[in-house]
Amino acid sequence: MIRDLSIAARGVWAPACANALVLPGKLNVLVGPSGAGKTSTIYALMQLIEPDRGEICLRDQDSATDINVRELAREQWWKTITWVPQHPTLIPGTLREQLPPASNDDLEAAASLCAFSDVLDSLPLRWDTPIGQGGIGLSVGQRQRFALTRALVATTPIVILDEPTAHLDAASEEVVLRAIETLRGQGRTVIAIAHRQALIEAADQVIEIHSAQMN
């Protein structure tokens, strides 16, 4: 739940969807003009920045009370989230070392769904291939597909996607939409920033964010 959230940047307040309820187990898409505060809203959710006004809360279904995410231990909160940034980077090491524990069958199934299998086939050691600083040797689109693969095999209840189709052609966009449908089918809450129409049309809920100059 987002309540009266505002984040200041360069003197501009971004009252990010003043009041909105994120639907659990559904695809929630954030839309709005560039600079409106979509990414800042995500950062606030992840405790990377602190809102200047308002709060983001979780609803405790048992007690019907709301818990401000700022009250949660950051490390424990992060364990519930898988984040796929717009420009994924990889740390030096093998691909397998950057994945959560999973069987080879699960990894291969996720890679196939995310159209990462062709990349794997081109690597000499597949999952055990060393990747350089920042994912050298993989394009931005390939790193994004790897990040989606990682999200599919993770078990976090929340998945955050920052413009997951931004660097993809129409065919690859369909791949991403299928992956998101799988996440939704797993009962996971997906929050995505989107500009492209196909992802917006696939949403269970569209949350509009607008910036506003405030004195």
Predicted feature descriptions by range:
Residues 40, 98, 129-215:
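ABC-family ATPase nucleotide-binding domain "signature/switch" substructure
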Residues 46:
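Helix-to-loop junction immediately C-terminal to a conserved catalytic motif
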Residues 55-79:
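ABC ATPase NBD Q-loop/coupling interface
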Residues 2-15, 56-58:
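Conserved beta1/A-loop at the N-terminus of ABC ATPase nucleotide-binding domains
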Residues 49, 82-104, 200:
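Conserved catalytic motifs of ABC-family nucleotide-binding domains
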